[in-house]
């Protein structure tokens, strides 16, 4: 009986492996971009907006970059939850208001704020801001 159970578990595993491989290879692919000296993962389908000018948020003045692409906000959220954790970043807060979501991460004394909001044309604007946290006094 035990042999039959082990055999069926192995069969199930072998059936799921191609599906898992497909999900891994077709998921939201990434590339790394350097912002304020940090390698930050960016979804592959996002292109940089070099002329985008915005006021930095206090605490995130070290550097910023803006991107735009046809990536759903939920995909961006899931992407950053996965890749930032894999790089050792800890989520510290999440904000949602008026069609704009933000997630803040910390690693050591460095801070990263990821903001994203959908456009009416089906694209999403992604803004990444980097800062340095002052040591406690």
Residue ranges of predicted features:
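Sec-dependent bacterial lipoprotein signal peptides
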Residues: 1-26
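An acidic-aromatic pocket/loop used at catalytic or ligand-binding sites
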Residues: 2-5, 27-137
């Amino acid at each position: 009986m035990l042999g039959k159970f082990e055999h069926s578990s192995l069969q199930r595993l072998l059936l799921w492996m191609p599906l898992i491989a497909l999900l891994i290879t077709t998921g939201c692919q990434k590339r790394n971009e350097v912002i304020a000296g940090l390698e930050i993962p960016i979804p592959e389908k996002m292109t940089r907006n070099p002329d985008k000018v915005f006021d930095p948020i206090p605490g995130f003045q070290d550097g910023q970059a803006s991107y735009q692409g046809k990536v759903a906000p939920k995909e961006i959220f899931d992407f950053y939850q996965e890749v930032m954790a894999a790089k050792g970043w800890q989520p510290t807060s999440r904000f949602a208001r008026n069609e704009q979501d933000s997630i803040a991460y910390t690693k050591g004394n460095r801070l990263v704020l990821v903001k994203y909001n959908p456009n009416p044309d089906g694209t999403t604007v992604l803004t990444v801001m980097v800062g340095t946290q002052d040591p406690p006094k």
